Amino acid sequence: MPKTSKRLASLVNKIEERAYEPLEAIKLVKENATAKFDETVEAHARLGIDPKYTDQQLRTTVALPHGTGQTVRIAVITRGEKVAEAKAAGAELAGDEDLVETISKGEMDFDLLIATPDMMPKVAKLGRVLGPRGLMPNPKAGTVTTDLAAAINEFKAGKLEFRADRTGIVHVRFGKASFSEGNLLDNLKTLQETIDRNKPSGAKGRYWKSLYVTSTMGPSVEVDIAALQDINKDG
């Protein structure tokens, strides 16, 4: 443990306490991702919202152009021929009441749960186990749907759901340290645009308080939000 602390301290010393240009911030994160595995790169955005008010909540999805670099394990709660359809589309788990029963026991070997609308009354009873993990299917997030194949393909390709936590901070993984700087920047830009586009109606004052990017084992680097917003993806 002390070895890790010493390593992290030396990396922190490389970073100045200021907001960096987006590409510069990503370069620093990549340089500091020196662990022996391919570290996940994450964004942490502090927003000027208070999610205890319903008109200041943020929950949506983003389709990252270059994916997350992670394998997403998907479970689907449905019935009849839709079970076979979900499995054929690539879902790791699919079932009806049997899967509901398995989940109710706390067995959740998946990262994302999709349900068809007809199964939601049964899924709603799983709120106690699904809610704290952020796994409850939601129509706004695209996880309550009858078009299972399309939803499974989108989430496998890099679409992901995110929400602001109770303190108004959004935590999103947007790639791997092995990604090119350009691909990480594309993904981060897409995330910023999604957060701006879904600004809650009740948000007051300054919407973006801060934005940091980091890798699994590396230090955080602050990003200049205005500079990120000014980037023209088509330019």
From Swiss-Prot:
InterPro entries: Ribosom_uL1_bac-type, Ribosomal_uL1, Ribosomal_uL1-like, Ribosomal_uL1/biogenesis, Ribosomal_uL1_3-a/b-sand, Ribosomal_uL1_CS. Pfam families: Ribosomal_L1. One of its GO terms (cellular component) is large ribosomal subunit. GO terms for biological process: regulation of translation; translation. Keywords: Repressor, Ribonucleoprotein, Ribosomal protein, RNA-binding, rRNA-binding, Translation regulation, tRNA-binding. The keyword Membrane does not apply. It comes from the Bacteria. CDD domains: Ribosomal_L1 (cd00403). PROSITE patterns: RIBOSOMAL_L1. One of its GO terms (molecular function) is structural constituent of ribosome. The keyword Repressor applies. Part of the 50S ribosomal subunit. Binds directly to 23S rRNA. The L1 stalk is quite mobile in the ribosome, and is involved in E site tRNA release. Belongs to the universal ribosomal protein uL1 family. This is Large ribosomal subunit protein uL1.
